[in-house]
Design a protein with these regions (language model features):
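Membrane-embedded helix-loop-helix hairpins and adjacent transmembrane boundary segments
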Residues: 1-526
Length: 526
């Protein structure tokens, strides 16, 4: 077998895809009258649109490139990132965290933290959100460059610049609405482009199962506690399944932003739950072809595991179908790239610039500032793409970002929700000490002072430790707090009670079905 080149019809498919992006962006532009329309679109979308955009954002660079690379190394154990690393966190976000965000009247996570703790925590969270969104945008940019390099032979830098210009154009044109509706369009392009690959690689999956059966089990090959192994059960359950998963779903700026676009509390609750069912199925679409890659490619593709998916498409698809496959990869990657760029702009403009630098300015002023922030995000994404290139594969970089910056933030959020005595000073100290703990541990790993079996396993334990330190500090209660000191923030938020969190019958049934399906799949693939 040999790699295919794109035919004129293949290029035509890509051109049609780009034309669709332009059309959606132009239509979306007509609806952006105020800064919230352009940057957040809070409580303005139907449930189906919010759920599809929520799923499409998550099925971008992380899944398509990163998960196929993980599958080529670890086999179906990459499904952990979808199932235990996705579903419990999504249900917790829907049933517990999201209602509190909405009932507080906040339009974003930083605004909620301002109401719960104070303005300094809001500022710190906004800064962390900007670092996180720029890093994830850079990872998507790096992945797009790899796709164009493998399929078209483009120079990595040239491919990154070309794709960045396309995304920059439609984000600047239509803002968050354009990002949401183009991501829905891109989601269906991803399904259409990758489904034939799932079918075509079936015989090779059978061969791989016969020769490497250990790569087709989720839990059986893993030891309970083995930091020197590639993965272990403690790291997967506590590090990935709890800390990283819950921190991503509950504190990622873009994830929260997409959920809050739904029009009401129950509509917003359905967004991550409905997306969870899609996530269960999409896992097979990406992981199973990646698991067959070692047998199919026979070492024919580049040394980087991140080139697994584009190499598979170039090998399996014909010249015309390859155009649809490339459009699918670009769709998922651009959706993640654009979503994080829009999130960066909202974090800077709405949470920092509007609140602390230039309040009470005309709405058009904030829209212009949001556009400049998008440009700044693209510049920072270039730096993040360079950092991502220093890791063995994309997923190692992404999980490290979540472990360092999102895990401590989750601890502060949970402390604020479950402990009425949690104060702004302790939340600030907890977040900062958690980040410093994670950075210190990663430095020790890099210097060889602490050894793990893989960078991924190190990421899981970094997440556990940084979260634990942050939680201990953020939730501490001293004698002044017990006596009701005035240093404690007056909470404008209602206390969290079981009755205030009780979902509707439909939402509750959907949540139970989603968790049951996740458990059943784990048992089947044990």
């Amino acid at each position: 077998m040999k790699f295919q080149a794109l035919s004129p019809w293949g290029f035509a498919v890509i051109a049609i895809y780009l034309a669709g992006l332009a059309l959606i962006s132009i239509v979306s532009r007509r609806r952006a009258f105020i800064a919230n329309d352009y940057l957040n679109a809070t409580h303005s979308l139907p449930t189906w649109a919010a759920a599809l955009s929520f799923l499409a954002y998550n099925c971008g660079s992380i899944e398509i490139i990163g998960m196929s690379a993980m599958a080529s190394q670890y086999g179906v154990q990459a499904l952990h990132f979808y199932w235990i690393g996705g579903i419990p966190g999504m249900v917790f976000f829907a049933l517990v965290v999201l209602p509190l965000y909405i009932r507080s009247g906040a339009r974003s996570l930083p605004e909620y933290l301002d109401r719960r703790f104070g303005p300094r925590v809001r500022l710190l969270n906004a800064c962390i959100s900007m670092v996180g969104t720029a890093s994830l945008a850079g990872a998507a940019l790096y992945a797009i460059a790899h796709v164009l390099h493998v399929v078209l032979g483009c120079n990595l830098l040239l491919g990154a610049l070309a794709s960045a210009m396309v995304v920059l154009a439609y984000v600047l044109l239509g803002g968050i609405r354009a990002t949401i509706y183009t991501s829905i369009f891109q989601f269906f392009v991803v399904i259409a482009g990758l489904f034939p690959l799932l079918m075509a690689t079936f015989p090779f999956r059978l061969t791989t199962f016969a020769q490497r059966p250990e790569t087709w089990h989720l839990w059986q090959p893993l030891l309970l506690f083995a930091p020197h192994a590639s993965l272990d059960r403690l790291g997967v359950v506590a590090g990935l399944g709890f800390v990283i998963s819950f921190s991503y779903w509950c504190t990622d700026f873009v994830v929260v932003q997409r959920a809050l676009t739904a029009r009401g509390v129950e509509e917003a609750r359905k967004v991550p739950i409905l997306a969870g069912f899609g996530k269960l199925a999409i896992a097979f679409l990406i992981v199973l072809p990646g698991a067959a890659a070692p047998m199919l490619l026979h070492g024919a593709h580049a040394a980087s595991h991140d080139e697994t998916m584009p190499a598979l498409l170039s090998l399996v698809y014909g010249p015309t179908l390859l155009g649809l496959g490339v459009a699918a990869l670009l769709s998922g990657l651009m959706a993640g790239f654009a979503g994080n760029a829009a999130g960066f702009a909202a974090a800077w403009t709405q949470e920092i610039y509007r609140v602390r630098i230039r309040p009470d300015r005309p709405e058009q002023h904030y829209i212009r500032m949001g556009r400049w922030a998008v440009v700044m995000c693209f510049l920072l994404a270039g730096l993040a793409a360079y950092l991502a290139a220093q890791f063995r594969d994309l997923m190692e970089f992404l999980q490290l970002v979540l472990s360092l910056f999102y895990a401590p933030l989750l601890a502060a959020v949970l402390a604020g929700m479950f402990r009425k005595q949690a104060r702004e000073r302790d939340a600030l100290a907890g977040i900062l000490l958690g980040v410093m703990t994670g950075i210190t541990l990663e430095a020790c790993v890099r210097l060889g002072a602490i050894r793990f079996g893989s960078q991924m396993n190190a990421n899981f334990y970094i997440a556990i430790l940084s979260f634990s330190v942050s939680m201990l500090v953020a939730s501490r209660v001293d004698s002044r707090t017990r006596q009701g000191s005035a240093a404690m923030v007056e909470l404008p938020l209602e206390p969290m009670t079981v009755s205030s969190l009780r979902p509707t019958f439909t939402t509750g049934v959907l949540s139970v079905l989603l968790l049951a399906a996740c458990l059943a799949l784990n048992l089947v693939w044990w």
